């Protein structure tokens, strides 16, 4: 019997597996795909958020700030690219300045250091190519960018060296409670474990609902991006956000650790969790909204 099974070979699954590998226990990662980082971990904004927008007092706020502080040491230990390029939240209308101040207050409450509101000539000093329509920005210098693929692979490699077993092409079909813990059923047989960590991304609700009386439903939200050539990579140096809405942080513009320029994402609720296509309308939306920033 295993002590812990982790379902999902993404960044959350392998961050968990690496931590478990520090202890004297038997752990395994189960993944339906043929390799690591095949889900959401391979397709995201690659941002290490500073932590100014999470509601103070929540687990998200605490984990965001704590995780941000870990990144310098973690990237050095595992040798993956990470850069603290800082982030800016743009305000285009003076009537929305109270919203920017609210984010600053949240940052202070969450323990995010050195966050301040910048206006006037200092905006252009930070980012010369920002739109002249920007009235003020929230500047969070601890924001960063990372390579999500190399980070996930590095976590996986370190987990494996430390004794965690990997089972790829092993789709979990059901989970049964037992007297000792859980029996995880897969297309390649059953795995018994005392504990199961559910790190299955957009499919986490399905595995939760197999064993928990508290049912969950995850509505998948698709985002489309445009990744530009390295010739455009230095157009901005910070990660540029527009003021957030209930749907998220909106269309961002950011350099990548590889020297490209990334813009996006859209935010579209969908029914098919496997739908990852891009569309002409979606990419046009990215271009139109990104142009508001710079």
Language-model features, listed with the residues they occupy:
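Conserved Rossmann-like nucleotide-cofactor binding loop
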Residues: 12, 35, 203
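Dinucleotide-binding Rossmann-like beta1-alpha1 core, especially the glycine-rich loop
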Residues: 46-126, 250-251
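Active-site substrate-recognition segment that forms the wall
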Residues: 15-22, 48, 78-83, 190, ...
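Glycine-rich FAD pyrophosphate-binding loop
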Residues: 22-42
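Short beta-strand to alpha-helix junction loop
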Residues: 62-65, 90-99, 138-157, 276-284
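Short Gly/Ser/Thr- and Asp/Glu-enriched loop/turn motifs at secondary-structure junctions
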Residues: 43, 83-87, 179, 221-223
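Helical element adjacent to the flavin cofactor pocket in flavoenzyme catalytic cores
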Residues: 138-195
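N-terminal Rossmann-like FAD-binding beta1-loop-alpha1 element of flavoenzymes
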Residues: 2-28
């Amino acid at each position: 019997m295993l002590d812990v099974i982790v379902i999902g070979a993404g960044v959350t699954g392998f961050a968990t597996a690496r931590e478990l590998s520090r202890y004297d226990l038997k752990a395994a990662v189960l993944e339906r795909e043929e390799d690591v980082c095949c889900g959401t971990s391979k397709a995201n904004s690659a941002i290490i958020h500073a932590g100014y927008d999470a509601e103070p007092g929540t687990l998200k706020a605490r984990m965001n700030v704590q995780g941000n502080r870990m990144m310098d040491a973690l990237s050095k230990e595992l040798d993956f690219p990470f850069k603290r390029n800082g982030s800016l939240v743009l305000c285009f209308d003076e009537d929305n300045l109270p919203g920017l101040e609210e984010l600053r207050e949240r940052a202070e409450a969450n323990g995010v250091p050195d966050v301040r509101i910048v206006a006037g000539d200092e905006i252009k000093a930070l980012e010369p190519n920002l739109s002249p329509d920007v009235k003020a920005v929230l500047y969070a210098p601890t924001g960063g960018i990372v390579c999500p693929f190399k980070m996930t692979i590095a976590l996986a490699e370190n987990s494996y060296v430390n004794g965690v077993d990997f089972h790829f092409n092993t789709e979990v079909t059901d989970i049964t409670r037992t007297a000792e813990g859980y029996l995880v059923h897969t297309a390649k047989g059953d795995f018994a474990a005392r504990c199961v960590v559910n790190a299955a991304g957009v499919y986490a609700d399905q595995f939760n609902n197999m064993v928990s009386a508290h049912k969950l439903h995850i509505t998948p939200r698709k985002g489309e991006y445009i990744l530009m050539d390295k010739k455009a990579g230095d157009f901005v140096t910070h990660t540029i956000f527009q003021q957030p809405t209930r749907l998220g942080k909106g269309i961002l513009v950011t350099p990548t650790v590889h020297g490209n320029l990334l813009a996006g994402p859209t935010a579209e609720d969908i029914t098919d969790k496997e739908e990852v296509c891009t569309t002409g309308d979606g990419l046009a939306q990215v271009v139109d909204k990104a142009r508001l920033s710079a």
